[in-house]
Amino acid sequence: MAEAVGAVALIAAPARRRWLWSVLAAMLGLLTARISALEVHTPKEIFVVNGTQGKLTCTFDSPNTTGWLTTVSWSFQPDGTDSAVSFFHYSQGQVYIGDYPPFKDRVTWAGDLDKKDASINIENIQAVHNGTYICDVKNPPDIVVRPGHIRLHVVEIDNLLVFLVWVVVGTVTAVVLGLTLLISLVLVVLYRRKHSKRDYTGCSTSERLSPVKQAPRKCPSDTEGLVKSPPSAGSHQGPVIYAQLDHSGGHHSGKINKSESVVYADIRKD
């Protein structure tokens, strides 16, 4: 009996090992397939007035939902240094703030992991807070991530007003220059079109329809010969009656008017 049980156990052992390896391979494949790069988005730089609250905005994109394993860490790299100091950590709904003096009792959580927002607020910002802030988010299995960097500038209220004035002046100047350039281009185009029409040497429609005045050709006719021929001796020439005809279509007609003298009768008395 014992020998039979041992034989069954020996036969089942390889099958069990194959089953375990299959399960592990499937789990590993599923885990590998779900791993993807988590993208963090932050503004490149922000300006905050000295003594006011500043919000460091940080959002992220992840194909996986957030949960208890999602963590957020903020670090600070002061100006002129190469190393960063971690001063804020958020995990499982809890906020952990370090003992770094510039941020003690100044930092509050302003994000919402359900909306994939990892922002924070810093109260009473001072000149010591000038530097680069680093937002790092982990959302397993999304572990491949590039942190976001924000360059924070602390400015005085007077400097900020001057900066805003220069921004407005620059914007208005750019708009005025753009409009001036556009108007100049339009005027140049209209000027060229106008002068191109003046320089055109072809015949226009009005020119084709306008009459050309020519010197009347004198063609001797019988009547003119009779009129101009000197009277023969002993003959008595009577009065010559002339008439002037106006070959026009009417007073308001657009036709060309032409007038000429026609000899209608030559009365002679012998």
Swiss-Prot record:
The UniProt entry, under Gene3D superfamilies, shows: Immunoglobulins
Membrane topology of this protein: Single-pass type I membrane protein
Record's subcellular location:
Membrane
Instruction: Tell me any Pfam family this protein matches.
Output: V-set
Specify the glycosylation sites in chain numbering.
N50, N130
Q: Which family does it belong to?
A: Belongs to the myelin P0 protein family.
Q: What does this protein do?
A: Cell surface receptor, which is involved in signal transduction processes. Recruits PTPN11/SHP-2 to the cell membrane and is a putative substrate of PTPN11/SHP-2. Is a major receptor for concanavalin-A (ConA) and is involved in cellular signaling induced by ConA, which probably includes Src family tyrosine-protein kinases. Isoform 2 seems to have a dominant negative role; it blocks tyrosine phosphorylation of MPZL1 induced by ConA. Isoform 1, but not isoform 2, may be involved in regulation of integrin-mediated cell motility.
Can you say what this protein is called? Myelin protein zero-like protein 1
Species of the source: Mus musculus
